[in-house]
């Protein structure tokens, strides 16, 4: 089994199957997804708690990133993608035809595997989303930039070079800048798709510490191939296999006393 420092883990008292509406950030109901004739997700249902870190784990191709991208409708951009089922945010199905997808993506931010800063200054990267919303007041932008860079634990490293090109930052700094850009528009939910897979161990540790801080303000959902990382940063973990949600429970249970044989086999390295 993966070794977990139980003294460092927050005890999760949530009954995930019966999570109250007040404690639920997102509810996924009977979600199926197909790319043409190929089905990638099969009847996935789960509730994701507010202001917690939920990790999706599983072998390559299991559907964890596909599921993550459903939460802010990034799969809309994929040809021949068809989705059945519901994802509820504030009790409303985000796949309802009346939903403003741009507004949804402002409320459900996403950070990808590789840092993707824009070819702009550090400052302009952070305030980009605010400018798109028509905010141009300099004081308001300055305050948002500092707040977001502090929130992404990078302010002290960049405060004296805000107008330098973002490409001059290290990989780890660029990823924190991208997180700052995502939280500048104050989303409720932050999706992280393998956010440290392209980073060195020191930068990875910094991002993991940041994730722990982010959950005080945001609901965080992370996809990771690194089981130790899931054990370190998440409050609950969902194990996926071949497009199905096999087991979903508090992280301590998943990594120490999983209920399903497939979960145990994956955690113990019998396949993956």
UniProtKB/Swiss-Prot annotation:
GO terms for molecular function: ATP binding; ATP hydrolysis activity; ATPase-coupled phosphate ion transmembrane transporter activity. It is found in: Cell inner membrane. One of its GO terms (cellular component) is plasma membrane. InterPro entries: AAA+_ATPase, ABC_transporter-like_ATP-bd, ABC_transporter-like_CS, P-loop_NTPase, PstB-like. It catalyses: phosphate(out) + ATP + H2O = ADP + 2 phosphate(in) + H(+). Its main location: membrane. This is Phosphate import ATP-binding protein PstB. It comes from Shewanella sp. (strain MR-4). The lineage of its organism: Bacteria, Pseudomonadati, Pseudomonadota, Gammaproteobacteria, Alteromonadales. The gene is pstB.
């Amino acid at each position: 089994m993966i070794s977990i420092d139980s003294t460092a883990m927050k005890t999760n008292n949530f009954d995930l199957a019966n999570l109250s509406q007040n404690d639920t950030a997102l509810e996924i109901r009977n979600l199926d997804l197909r790319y043409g004739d190929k089905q990638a997700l099969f009847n996935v249902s789960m509730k994701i708690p507010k202001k917690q870190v939920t990790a999706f784990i599983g072998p390559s191709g299991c559907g964890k990133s596909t599921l993550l991208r459903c939460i802010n409708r990034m799969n809309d951009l994929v040809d021949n993608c068809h989705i059945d089922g519901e994802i509820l945010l504030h009790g409303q199905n985000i796949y309802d035809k009346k939903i403003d997808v741009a507004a949804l993506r402002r409320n459900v931010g996403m950070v990808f595997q590789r840092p993707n800063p824009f070819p702009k200054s550090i400052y302009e990267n952070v305030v980009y989303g605010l400018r798109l919303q028509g905010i141009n007041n300099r004081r308001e932008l300055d305050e948002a930039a500092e707040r977001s860079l502090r929130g992404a634990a990078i302010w002290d490293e960049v405060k004296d070079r805000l107008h330098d090109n973002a490409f001059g930052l290290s990989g780890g700094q660029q990823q924190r800048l991208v997180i700052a850009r995502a939280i500048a528009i104050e989303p409720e939910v932050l999706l992280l798709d393998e956010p440290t897979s392209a980073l060195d161990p020191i930068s990875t540790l910094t991002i993991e510490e940041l994730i722990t801080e982010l959950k005080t303000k945001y609901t965080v959902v992370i996809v990771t191939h690194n089981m130790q990382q899931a054990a370190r940063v998440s409050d609950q973990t969902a194990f996926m296999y071949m497009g199905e949600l096999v087991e979903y429970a508090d992280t301590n249970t998943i990594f120490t006393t999983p209920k399903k044989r497939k979960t145990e086999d994956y955690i113990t390295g019998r396949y993956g």
